[in-house]
Amino acid sequence: MENQLQNKPIIELRSIKKSYGSNTIINDFNLTINNGEFVTILGPSGCGKTTVLRLLAGLEELDSGSIILDGEDITNVPAEKRHINTVFQSYALFPHMTIFENVAFGLRMQKVPNEEIKPRVLEALRMVQLEEMADRKPTQLSGGQQQRIAIARAVVNKPKVLLLDESLSALDYKLRKQMQQELKMLQRQLGITFIFVTHDQEEAITMSDRIVLLRKGKIAQDGSPREIYEDPANLFVARFIGEINVFEATVIERKSEQVVLANVEGRICDIYTDMPVEKDQKLQVLLRPEDIVIEELDENEHSKAIIGHIIDRTYKGMTLESTVEFDHNGMRVLVSEFFNEDDPHMDHSIGQRVGITWHEGWEVVLNDEDNQ
């Protein structure tokens, strides 16, 4: 029964359109979100992600299309009557009220009986581990504590969906990392559908069950963090999520259903793809920095790898990042290796001649024509 509830759609956006004047932000936009999911709507500035959130919250009106919440059409339902709450970037806490009164505010607006308010507020504060702060003012709390109070206020009236609008961006790095974990744990505890809007791909990967990546008002890819990172649908997705190296390739022949022999930046090698290809077709081979293998070479040593030289290196604690410039065309690639201080071949020096290969099958192969 629980799995059936989790697989049940809680939000459906059907063919929605929104314009501001002559500028169409989203058009014929469709999205289904299931009950209990933590979904992140991700994308660069101007992609339409905040517009989608505001439409869900009822803060903007649709030009056309419909919004369905738990089977009910709420397209024309005002914001205050939707079972959807929003945590904004600013948290919007009332500075003159105590924490208790901040959390109780929504219940009082809904005319909840006084005898119900105290236990519900304390329960919400207990969920975010701030019950002992009930009598303090927001200015007496840290940024992370204010974040949790804003969430407590948003969940106290038991919404079906919680929207979070870039609500971690004001925190410092360490606190932001901590809150990412706390938010995910809280979402699991509450069982409420969370829809998180951000431009930060690291946040999206860390917290989400599912990422919806937008580009110019369209869905560029919809999938799990792992699917989007390891199997990007196109070059935009690959470049937006993490670092990526893009190699030019030319098909020589298909060897099997999964394997193509190709010339990749001058290296004749197998690449793994089941897409239809023809001889001399141009492809792009995408490799994450951690997928690439560096082999140190003497200046006159022969190798079947792609040859280049180290032009920069950055120690990052657990990893060593090296920038390699290819000899044949000056292209630069980023390589990330787990740092091992006992390995004499790990700490590459500037100017070192190297050969570049990769773990077979870890590459992503895209059709050159599809990656504009």
Swiss-Prot record:
Pfam families cross-referenced by the UniProt entry: ABC_tran, TOBE_2
Claim: Nucleotide-binding is one of the keywords in the record: yes
Residues spanning the signal sequence: none
Catalytic reaction(s) noted: ATP + H2O + polyamine-[polyamine-binding protein]Side 1 = ADP + phosphate + polyamineSide 2 + [polyamine-binding protein]Side 1
Primary localization: membrane
Molecular functions (GO terms): ABC-type putrescine transporter activity; ATP binding; ATP hydrolysis activity
One GO CC annotation: ATP-binding cassette (ABC) transporter complex
Keyword vocabulary terms for this entry: ATP-binding, Cell inner membrane, Cell membrane, Membrane, Nucleotide-binding, Translocase, Transport
Subcellular location: Cell inner membrane
Protein topology in the membrane: Peripheral membrane protein
Residues reported in the UniProt entry to bind ATP: 43-50
ABC transporter domain ranges (all copies): 11-241
Function: Part of the ABC transporter complex PotABCD involved in spermidine/putrescine import. Responsible for energy coupling to the transport system.
Similarity section: Belongs to the ABC transporter superfamily. Spermidine/putrescine importer (TC 3.A.1.11.1) family.
Record-linked NCBIfam families: potA, PRK09452.1
Subunit structure: The complex is composed of two ATP-binding proteins (PotA), two transmembrane proteins (PotB and PotC) and a solute-binding protein (PotD).
UniProt protein name: Spermidine/putrescine import ATP-binding protein PotA
